[in-house]
Amino acid sequence: MDYLIKAIAYDGKVRAYAARTTDMVNEAQRRHDTWPTASAAIGRTMTASLMLGAMLKGEDKLTVKIEGGGPIGAIVADANAKGEVRAYVSNPHVHFDLNEQGKLDVRRAVGTDGTLSVVKDLGLRDYFTGQVEIVSGELGDDFTYYLVSSEQVPSSVGVGVLVNPDNTILAAGGFIIQLLPGTDEETISTIEKQLSQIEPISKLIQKGLTPEEILEEVLGQKPDVLETMPVKFHCSCSKDRFETAILGLGKKEIQDMIEEDGKAEAVCHFCNEKYLFTKEELEELRDETTR
């Protein structure tokens, strides 16, 4: 079962998050029919976005957008404080041979010429936006760079996805480690040593390690778990929302739809759900609109 934990370690000097996201990424793969390299890219992005979302409170939410200039196009993920994530990729049918390390070549798919941006909606008038250049294209390092440079928190992000031969997801998950102000050199060097020795995160999940055990591997000590929360792929789209969008087109455009096709189909970017509007429904919307 997918879930996320929030924890502290080293007498509260280190804040940590870890998650198993296999089912969540599998749902995205199923909905978007992503090929393996695209699955790894969207899965890593969703996992990191989930953990960034877990740092928020209440109704706060955020959107992550990655545009690296690669063949995959843009990757967009929405996450909130409740463990819900949805995401899409411009070109889901992208796959390459494995790279020199024998891993899915996410860097080649994402590209290295572009930006990673995070827009936070904290319920205030203005959104908080942080943007960094893509430094790696492998995404874990890029999210690390975002946290260090945009949020000024020394951090390490690990995200991984393993894909089955039939394109379904074998394992997915990740961790974020953050050093709080006043962390001593000894703690820092211990964690750096641990990070340099651990196996790839997706391998740890494939082996059956829980998020708690993953953090123990990463930190070199048992973390103090503060909160455990279920996580899932969740999209907030609905037919009502698309009705509102159609109303916004105005009478003429709705009339054109009726005359040209006699119906309309709306598809949600984030979850690929399709909503069909019949001729009668379109006529009702046309008569309702004031524009």
From Swiss-Prot:
What family does the entry list? Answer: Belongs to the HSP33 family.
Q: Cellular location of this protein?
A: Cytoplasm
Role description: Redox regulated molecular chaperone. Protects both thermally unfolding and oxidatively damaged proteins from irreversible aggregation. Plays an important role in the bacterial defense system toward oxidative stress.
Native source species: Bacillus velezensis (strain DSM 23117 / BGSC 10A6 / LMG 26770 / FZB42)
Modification after translation, per record? Under oxidizing conditions two disulfide bonds are formed involving the reactive cysteines. Under reducing conditions zinc is bound to the reactive cysteines and the protein is inactive.
Q: What is this protein called?
A: 33 kDa chaperonin
Q: List the disulfide bonds.
A: 235-237, 268-271
Q: Where the protein is mainly located, per its record? A: cytoplasm
Q: Which Pfam families match?
A: HSP33
Q: Give the SUPFAM superfamilies listed for this entry.
A: Hsp33 domain, HSP33 redox switch-like
Keyword Chaperone listed: yes
